[in-house]
Amino acid sequence: MELPHLWQPASRLDVAGSLSAWFDSELGRELLVAENRLLGHILPDLFGYHALQLGQLVSANLLLGSRIRHRIVADTALQPVEGLSPLLARPDSLPLADSSVDVVVLHHLLDVSANPHAVLREASRVLLPEGHLVILGFNPWSLWGLWRFFRMPWASTPWLRQVLSPHRMSDWLTLLDFDVVGVESAFFLPPVDTALVRRRLSWLEPLGMRYWSQGGASYALLARKRVSCLTPLRLRQPLLQLLRPALLTETRSSQDSHQQRED
């Protein structure tokens, strides 16, 4: 008989709720500022008519730096945010047409999703060919990732729950016909809650940006959806063109002889 588990897996709402609450902490707000700085370098160069923020872990307009006018935020529960049109929907089942959105931003949604593959497939479905996908997630190859090995498994730190590396994201996106444009990261301080300690370690920021630019606590991955190259089917040839010439000659001869007998 199988013994019961001591730690039950948390649901997506539990993990999302704890991470959302963590973003209200001082450390969480500092990371969010760094992530918005990353988005500020990426979004202005992406154009189109419709932009979608998929998932709302923070009550902020993460599409603020985008030049696209129509901006949507979609999730199962939403807080009103100025500049974003709300769409109540599951991130893995959107009421949007295929190939209808130019830019999709996933803000730590894959870190808390019970089925990240399904979320990625849905983002791919609604994206136009040549549309762009921006993924923000916690970086396992950072000081924050190393921090996992020094914490107990029951720790409430949200980023310990599910960490997906940029390399794994790249593999998944390749299978979905995406080209990875590039990856950047931000916030090179360790995840310590004491502000005084973070200030004393502030020298790590310029050092990390210079020598370990993809080793920040949070990464932003930009990918472009490929254009499907469809081979057009040949039109069906008329039936007479498909018949052999000999058969055509025989058919015409029989028609002529029949016409002569009637005359």
Predicted regions and their residues:
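C-terminal lobe and adjacent flexible extensions of AdoMet/dcAdoMet transferase-like proteins
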Residues: 203-263
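Short alpha-helix
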Residues: 160-183
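Class I SAM-dependent methyltransferase Rossmann-like catalytic core
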Residues: 1-44
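A short acidic, Gly/Pro-enriched loop at the edge of an enzyme's catalytic core
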Residues: 92-104
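Conserved catalytic loop of SAM-dependent methyltransferase domains
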Residues: 180-205, 214-215
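A short glycine-rich, Lys/Arg-flanked "PGG" loop and its adjoining helix->strand segment in the class I
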Residues: 117-132
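Conserved class I S-adenosyl-L-methionine
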Residues: 132-160
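Class I SAM-dependent methyltransferase SAM/SAH-binding core
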Residues: 37, 41-94
